[in-house]
Amino acid sequence: MGLAGALAAVTADTWATELGVLASGRPRLITTGESVEAGTSGGITLTGTAAAAAGASLIALVGSSLGGQRLVISAAIGGLGGALFDSVLGATIQAIYYCPACDRQTERHPLHSCGTETVLVRGWPWLENDAVNFFASVAGALIAIGGWRLLG
């Protein structure tokens, strides 16, 4: 069950990121609702959230032969929960850097894509995007396990 939740979470996050850019409106920060630029860590759109739910549901449906409706519900909720947790971490404690040459915030460190050294502006320096993805997948697994137990 944990594996299904983790896979659903990473799929949901990927679909939200890749399809969320198709949204017509600007993303909003998950924590405050503030309008942010596309690509901002912690920014969400209705399109991206719907894509996350669809991605999580697809993984849950693939696993349905192993656990039926109980698995589908638990994994789908775990997947969406993990993806939303990823956004919360991105909006609050993920390391975000500033590139003075490009005048942009970025996740890249120590050098931005232009080759300029970046400076930490918020978050924990060790909590970069890969760590956020790891914690989000663990959250998806734990939520799915919790759902499995509650529905049992």
Name what the model sees in each region.
Residues 1-152:
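Hydrophobic alpha-helical transmembrane segments
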